Amino acid sequence: EASWENGVRSLRKSEMGSLRKLLGDVFFAELPDIQPHAINAENASNLLVVVEDGEVVSHIATIKRHVSVLGCSLKIASLGGVATYKSHRGKGHASALLEKTMAVCRNEGVDYIMVSGYRNMYHRYGCRHVGKDWEFRLDQEQASNFDDTGFTISHASKEDIDALGAIYR
């Protein structure tokens, strides 16, 4: 295989299956299905990968959008899905992908980058925690104190992906 086939580059549409396999191994198999706005063939130019011997071994996804915040137009990028097979970690792949992504965002005039998750690597590249996250946990006894007669709780299925995606967006 030619050396230019390997290394850091955009995903080729024909490699979507290899990317899905990586994301399924590192995260969970349904990740591309619940993030179709990011992980899709049409967004392949914003899906940077490291390929070794024809296999996608590391990945970062980017979505770029224009938003208005209090009347100010901004170009934002959202980064996520950073994944590397365990057998390929420690080679600098994720760092190379993040560095390339940050350079592309800078060159394209992105004003603000949001990163999904936290790793020391993000901090090394200038990312910082902003805002607050809240996490609440209830045990069964505490949950039984709520009047939930007006609600139905059920498991989501593949048929719910479009509706859940619309709520997310």
Name these PLM-found stretches:
Residues 134-142:
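Gly/Ser-rich phosphate-binding catalytic loop and adjacent alpha/beta segment
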Residues 91, 142-144:
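Accessory recognition modules or surfaces
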Residues 1-59, 63-64, 71-78, 144-169:
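Short amphipathic alpha-helix that is part of the acyltransferase structural core
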Residues 102, 106-112, 151-152:
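Short active-site oxyanion
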Residues 65-67, 87, 120:
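Short coil/turn motifs at secondary-structure junctions
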Residues 84, 90-103, 114:
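Conserved acetyl-CoA-binding loop-helix of GNAT-fold acetyltransferases
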Residues 107-111, 117-135:
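Conserved active-site alpha-helix within GNAT-family acetyltransferase domains
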